[in-house]
């Protein structure tokens, strides 16, 4: 009879042999009855409303529709024509007539499922039911493997699924070992020659189970013939193996090693057989449970009422099913098993889509049922089920390879978000859980709009939520809400920020005002309301960056004396402010925006629409598919007709057709459609107020502290680079010039150029104290723009750039799709160099140790300068690069390549263009700011501040960016953000005399601190000098001293007088003093027994023991002269060590012993005797800095 080939919907061609060996590892197939399988219960449920699964305010819940239910249905639709493979119900023999009876019953399925209106295939998101057929097993032949085929026909798609014993061939207890070896052997042959096996599969697909008993007889004959052939082949293989063993017995040592290697395939076969048997037994149970679960869910859905007992029964079945799914997946994907078995397990999981079935059938189905009965069911059922699935999934992902766990990260977030609606009593916990798992998923998944959207609904940081919402509508797999729904979600984000205004964060008021005005710019009526536009502009010009106390973070004169908390707030949120304005400029999902068209947003919207239509057509018969193909062909013909007849169509009609195509997504946007007039017309859809506000915010950040300006300007530079790169790909020269004019006029180039020159000056002033500057400049100087971008994209470490990944505009620079990683936390494979940048707090990007010590500041600064330089070289943006050395300060040593780098600007008169279309563009896009004479004069000395005529070196609080004595508190702890601000430094204009004395003392210690850090400081050597703490210091800091001694960072000595004083203080009436003295005594004794503290007598000699007390018996008045005894001991020890040591060449006196005390009277007495005295703050600060350099813990 003629052969026809029908594609199996669950078959992956490259994995057919593994699927075959999984199903055909049994003896000869036996016919069996085929009971009817019910239709999936999800088609019996009603639609879910968004308000049930969306974190929205109660007032807005009624306006939402079908969000999470769409997620559930979309998850189900991804399983194309789902099929549960058949299993054996019993081991009893079945006769052939039983099979004939079943075939007759297929034409008349159970009325309970056919007559139900809820079971009808009317919804577009329903999944077609495939007809299951007998899986014909074919044993391995001489040149092939065991192939199991399931015959599927699109005409029978609506018929109920059949379950037969022959549909899945399991390994019976009596199966012989030879058949098991055939399975693994066939898999190996398949791996080596997949094309040969695919050819054999195609020839075997021609059988159709639905024809008649003749086909079944043919199948049986074919199976018998294959068995006979296989037995012959096995005999030959056994003979060959025997000969091989005889030869190996006569070989030498090297051949013995080869013999050992030849045994490995046999071992692989045995382990593979064991794995397959285990998975088959699990699969039997899984399919039984799937059938029972679907039947019970269907009965419960069709019934008018529900009993609690029925829900708990379904719960028990479903939880067991989930457990078996998880066991199946972890068994198949166990990383510790042999590689051969892991490959087998991976292919079995992929072919049978076990992971998808776990999610859709094991999780979504019951949640769907629970949603319908949420009003009158026991909430404990929902709670227990969600918790059980959540724990099972979160535990499973730690036991499987990372590339399989990435998908489950997002699904755990989805499950947590669904739990918010189904189990609202734990709203906060599930919301935090959803945010955590979505955050983990976003480390690996990019360009996925639904993920960004779902993250925005649960994210605590409302500014980041606003950015993620913008990314969801401007990425490749874009999320496409209606304008009304988008406005609803934006309003919800603002309301969340407003509700949290009193949570103790004083900066929330700034965020609330920003979100309020950003939301206003996205209103549909905003472009038609000049008054509202003026209100928004006034806010960004006059109020943005000013707190309730009137403190302006963007006042250039105060850039070095900013409040550290205020500084870190804008540092953490600066990148989000930039991304927010960029996403608003590109239209926030408006496809007719010129930037959206440039970055091909309509193309991805059409691809998404076509993908949906293909999914719909896949649920229909093949004729519908052919019809859609014909329609697609007709669309292409229409495109050709339209483009060929443009001469007869007016420009107005052509533009109308162009924008109509964008709205309807009827045809793709071809490059020939992007005429000059079309580009000009798109400017009507550009929110000019939003563009102006973004430029205002950028200019404000450039006037602020350098530390917060860099994280904000870097996304803008990347955005400008992406515009230039994308526009350079346009074929029309006028269109290229169109975008260059927009770039020249829209951005604040005068402020940007001045900022770059000031940044260069600042780097040159710090190059001597920060060697990293020279190293970075040497590395970046020899790279072009493309090489720089490639370098950073392959090893990104800045969180502000990582946040831009996934957007369409960043895809122009480097497309970041979903990546698979080979090992856990190996982020280098996806281009992330510093994975710690991913662990950002909820309050913006992370301000970590590398930011505290300035390392990332220098990396940001050098990257900004060299990217800006190469951007100016590569594209005609109006920036001129001068390489003439210009002297900025007399202290500069122009050994760095930055010493000869200066940025200048073309005059504004050079921007004008005589082309009419471009002239019209100039009347629409205003120049963002005028250009100063200093920046246009190629020979003028650049400005030293963004404020014309100012000098940053004369600003209050200016200092070099390095850790000095003022960066540490009284306990020696580093003060956060102290590198960037002198907020902590006392004011020299104090009227209090004591404060002035302290200020002068601190100023003296600043220079000494920087000298002590140097290894060649002539007065103190940390390997030789002994540090002697007084009793008060031991009482306060005994634990800190113990830590320093254990790390051998310093050498310590102690006067016996101090030790005896501490012993005496153990009898103090003050409990705090008593406890501190006891701790000090214990610490000193421990250090003494470890030879880490040196005891000194009154005479300066080393005592024989720390408990020595002979001198105290002789000097009974020591208690009244403790300070004098300590000073005397230190002075004599210094003299003895000086006389015993070799003379030093340095004219400055070397200090062998240094006294550490915070007692001003004692310090004054010691200084009178020329004893070097330091404070505990100085010593601990010094140790903190030295510990950082040596990677030692000092606290």
Swiss-Prot record:
Origin superkingdom: Eukaryota
Compartment(s) where it occurs, according to its Swiss-Prot or TrEMBL record: Cytoplasm; Nucleus; Peroxisome
Composition skew (Low complexity), residue ranges: 210-252, 619-629
Main location: cytoplasm
Compositional bias per record (Basic and acidic residues), positions renumbered to this chain: 83-109, 197-208
Bias-annotated ranges (Polar residues): 1-10, 18-35, 55-68
GO BP annotations, alphabetical order: nuclear-transcribed mRNA catabolic process, nonsense-mediated decay
Keyword vocabulary terms for this entry: Cytoplasm, Nucleus, Peroxisome
Role of this protein: May be involved in the regulation of gene expression responses of environment-sensing pathways.
Subunit structure: Transiently interacts with PEX14.
Protein name: EST/SMG-like protein 2
Species annotation: Saccharomyces cerevisiae (strain ATCC 204508 / S288c) (Baker's yeast)
